[in-house]
Amino acid sequence: MRWDLSFKRQALGDPVSEGRRVWEWIQRVRPLHPSLDLWRPTAESREEAEQSPPITQDYLLQYIHDAQTTSRYPDFSLAPAFSGQIGQGNKLDLSFNMPNPGNAGIGLMTGEALGSALDASEELADTLMHTTASIFSPNIIGGLSRSDHPIKNLNRDKPYPFFYVPGWKMFFASDSPHYQRATQLATNIAPVSNGAIFTFGTPDTYPTILNQW
């Protein structure tokens, strides 16, 4: 099954300096699963991906700098790299000044191998969430979501009050207005960084629990 990891935080510096934290995160998650070990530049073809050398910190920082320079607006996003098997790997997404000035975001769309590992191991899910929350403090909100759950129909149903993708595991900052309600609904709470990681039931039941919000 495919999973999506995403975190939104308050940036501590400019996008390039935030890139150094992204590089630290890459180094920290590499040992967690074989598909996270080798990171390559995003490519337009399979052949190009196969021929590309692994990314370096300098490559990542230059990629962010170039994206910022060529963007017409202060807010911009980019997909600089992927890890794992070509065509079935894990895609890295970054955003800056979105949705608000000073915000920064990181996302990881898992491939088949890492997705299957997350299906089988809650410990891996917890470690991935904890590592991400620790590196990107101060965080605002984050989550780990399974992609097969239906998307909420916002024309029919109200959006979640926290205005974020609902997740099996979610991070809320301790000063978040949603922290208390998360505490009431969670089946497990693990303090970390400037808040806590909340687990809502199981990968199958978390949408039902969060719909009580």
Regions found by a protein language model. Name each.
Residues M1-E44, S145-W213:
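C-terminal interaction module
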Residues M1-S6, S95-S116:
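Glycine-rich, often proline-containing surface loops adjacent to acidic residues and nearby aromatics
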Residues S17, V22-N90:
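N-terminal low-complexity, intrinsically disordered segments
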Residues R72-L92, P166-L185:
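Generic detector of solvent-exposed, compositionally biased contiguous segments
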Residues L78-G84, M109-E112, A190, G195-G201:
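Generic recognition of long tandem-repeat/solenoid scaffolds
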Residues D93-P99, A186-I189:
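Short amphipathic beta-strand and strand-loop transition segments with alternating hydrophobic
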Residues G102-A104, S137, V192-G195:
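Short, solvent-exposed coil/turn segments at beta-strand boundaries
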Residues G107-P161:
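Short helix-loop boundary/capping segments
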